Structure formats: C-alpha cells, structure tokens
C-alpha cells in the first residue's frame, strides 16, 4: 500500500503553480488604508497591479494592537522591503481612512528607502450615505 500524502500540501492535481516573477518597476503607487482596527499597505505598479502588500495583522499583531501606529510602521516597512526586491524606488502615496497609522506609515515608507513623491488623501466622503452607528456611552 502506498504511503498517504498529507492533505493540503502542494498544488492540486492538474493545477499549475504560479512562480512569483521578479517585476522591474522603478515607479509605483503606495495605497495606505488605515481603519480604526487595522492598517493595510499595498504597493502597486502604475497600472494598479499589486507588487507587494502587508498589514498590521499580517506582520503579527492581533486585536487592538493592530490599530496602533507602531503596527502600521512595521507593516509599511515590510511592504516597502518586498517592493524594493521588485525594483521599486519611487512611490506616490494614496491614503484612505481615519485610522491612527496614516502618518506613521508614510514616514516609515520614506525611512525604508523609498522616495515619496505626491501624497494624496483619497478617503471617500459620503454625500449623506448610510446612517452612522449610534453614539458610544462609556
């Protein structure tokens, strides 16, 4: 009897594995989505294809620590390091959301060695959209 293969390891039968190819993109865009609970940093090429990403949760923080500026800093550094492997040197930054990690993430992108060009806030503004949640009583 042949030995059993562990379930969930490797590609399924008839499925091609996608090797991660090294893209050479000198200029890209960094999208920072900072919510009250998490910060997600995505670095894309000019067409919008994702080159690298990282989030506070992906870096290893859980619960309320994901929303801290330090977690956003580590996420931005992680994404910048991955993007630099693909040749990214200059980024335009697009910030979205009201979270606490906005400025910290931009600063850590600069500290990681990426040259930051334009910084723009693309937070969506409702034209009286959905009803907001009720006020907290603490």
Curated annotation (Swiss-Prot):
Feature: compositional bias, Basic residues: 13-22
One Gene Ontology cellular component annotation held by this UniProt entry: ribosome
Region (Disordered): 1-29, 117-138
Record has Ribonucleoprotein as a keyword: yes
Domain of life: Bacteria
UniProt keyword annotation of Ribonucleoprotein present: yes
UniProtKB keywords: Ribonucleoprotein, Ribosomal protein, RNA-binding, rRNA-binding
InterPro entries: Ribosomal_uS11, Ribosomal_uS11_bac-type, Ribosomal_uS11_CS, Ribosomal_uS11_sf
A GO term, aspect molecular function: structural constituent of ribosome
SUPFAM superfamilies: Translational machinery components
GO biological process terms held by the UniProt record: translation
NCBIfam families: PRK05309.1, uS11_bact
Family from the record: Belongs to the universal ribosomal protein uS11 family.
Cited function: Located on the platform of the 30S subunit, it bridges several disparate RNA helices of the 16S rRNA. Forms part of the Shine-Dalgarno cleft in the 70S ribosome.
Self-association state and partner proteins as the record states: Part of the 30S ribosomal subunit. Interacts with proteins S7 and S18. Binds to IF-3.
Protein name per the record: Small ribosomal subunit protein uS11
């Amino acid at each position: 009897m042949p030995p059993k293969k562990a379930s969930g390891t490797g590609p399924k039968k008839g499925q091609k594995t996608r090797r991660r190819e090294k893209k050479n993109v000198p200029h890209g865009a960094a999208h920072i989505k900072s919510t009250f609970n998490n910060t997600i940093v995505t670095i894309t090429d000019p067409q919008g294809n994702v080159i690298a990403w990282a989030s506070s949760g992906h870096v290893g923080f859980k619960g309320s620590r994901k929303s801290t500026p330090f977690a956003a800093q580590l996420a931005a550094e992680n994404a910048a390091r991955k993007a630099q492997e693909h040749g990214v040197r200059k980024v335009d930054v697009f910030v979205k959301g009201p979270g606490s990690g906005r400025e910290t993430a931009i600063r850590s992108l600069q500290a990681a060695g990426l040259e930051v060009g334009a910084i723009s806030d693309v937070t969506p503004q409702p034209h009286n959209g959905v009803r907001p949640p009720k006020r907290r009583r603490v």
